[in-house]
């Protein structure tokens, strides 16, 4: 059983240290451990070229136009049975680097779309994708903040697990953490998070758990949260209404007070649309396939070309100072 720890903080700073605290605890449970300081790796931002989604829905393979370390990083994550991310909290949320790896995960590594690609490859008489891409994985997140600005980081962090459909064990943040290594309660909690992750990873191995079929059968430690489906706790409330949508899984409903706490009420008949389960991913993949098809046809449309040419000619972009001679 292998546990990978990934820190996105300064070298040997609080995030690195707390990640290693959890890894040490996982090692004591029998895990093989590995540590990555992600700032040492060349990870570029997603350009939005959609080569990945087109490659998947058209059966061409897993494609990315960026030439950097992300593919190697993704393979490291896939090889592990459990993964822990420890990320500094920037302006209440995840770091820019963390957002970049989340953007790079989806849709190019979305399990639903990869299943579609796997089927297309096999239909064409070719070898399908490596089965390990469809194996379930335990994943945990910890945000480390210097103050109490932290309430967006849990949703930001969980987005990384959304595309592959991996199981989130713990998703937490620690505030006021400049001296966190001296705060015994938080150090002990990190040890517990490491042990929880090792236990969940071992359960996945023992049950040979795949992403498909394990969406509602995995019992993990949870906090009391508003939405029992994805354990989301952040919602967009439509102005002037009681209608809201979970920022994580996309289910829509209303917030109600039950036993002194907010609970999210939604129609169970809509659950198949949720972004974190395969049925919702297949729907999303079909939407992308149809939209890409419409766009490809538009490229042949004279009116489309005319409008593109008109607005492209309105103004030129200002050159980047670093690229000027």
Residue ranges and their predicted role:
Residues 1-102, 106-107, 197-198, 202-325:
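N-terminal beta1-alpha1-beta2 submodule of the flavodoxin-like/Rossmannoid cofactor-binding fold
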Residues 7, 143-145, 173-175:
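Short, histidine-centered active-site or binding-site loop motifs used for metal coordination
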Residues 21-29, 153-167:
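Active-site-adjacent alpha-helix of alpha/beta-hydrolase-fold enzymes
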Residues 32-35, 166-175:
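Short beta-strand elements in bilobed, periplasmic/extracellular small-molecule ligand-binding domains
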Residues 61-161:
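Helix-loop-strand module that forms the ligand-binding subsite of alpha/beta enzymes
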Residues 163-171, 191-208:
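A charged, well-structured terminal subsegment
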Residues 176-180:
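Active-site rim beta-loop-alpha module in soluble metabolic enzymes
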Residues 181-192:
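Catalytic cores of secreted or luminal carbohydrate-active enzymes
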């Amino acid at each position: 059983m292998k546990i990978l720890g990934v820190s996105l903080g300064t070298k040997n700073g609080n995030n690195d240290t707390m990640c290693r605290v959890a890894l040490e605890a996982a090692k004591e449970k029998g895990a093989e451990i590995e540590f990555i300081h992600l700032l040492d790796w060349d990870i570029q931002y997603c350009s939005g070229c959609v080569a990945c989604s087109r490659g998947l829905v058209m059966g061409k393979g897993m494609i990315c136009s960026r030439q950097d370390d992300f593919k190697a990083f993704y393979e490291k994550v896939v090889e592990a049975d459990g993964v822990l991310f420890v990320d500094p909290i920037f302006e209440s949320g995840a770091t820019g680097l963390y957002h970049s790896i989340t953007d790079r995960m989806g849709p190019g590594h979305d399990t639903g779309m990869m299943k579609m690609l796997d089927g297309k490859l096999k239909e064409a008489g070719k070898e399908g994708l490596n089965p390990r891409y469809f194996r379930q994985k335990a994943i945990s997140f910890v945000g480390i903040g210097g103050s109490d600005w932290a309430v967006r980081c849990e949703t930001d962090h969980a987005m990384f697990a959304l595309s592959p459909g991996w199981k989130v064990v713990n998703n937490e943040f620690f505030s006021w953490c400049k001296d966190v290594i001296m705060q015994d309660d938080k150090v002990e909690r990190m040890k517990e998070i490491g042990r929880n992750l090792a236990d969940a990873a071992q359960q996945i191995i023992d049950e040979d758990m795949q992403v498909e079929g394990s969406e509602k059968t995995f019992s993990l430690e949870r906090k009391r949260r508003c939405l029992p489906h994805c354990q989301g706790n952040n919602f967009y409330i439509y102005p002037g209404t009681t209608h809201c949508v979970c920022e994580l899984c996309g289910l829509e409903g209303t917030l109600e007070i039950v036993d002194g706490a907010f609970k999210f009420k939604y129609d169970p008949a809509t659950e198949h649309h949720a972004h974190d389960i395969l049925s919702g991913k297949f729907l999303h993949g079909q939407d992308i396939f149809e939209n890409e098809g419409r766009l490809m046809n538009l490229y042949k449309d004279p009116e489309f070309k005319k409008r593109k040419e008109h607005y492209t000619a309105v103004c030129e972009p200002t050159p980047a100072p670093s690229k000027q001679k």
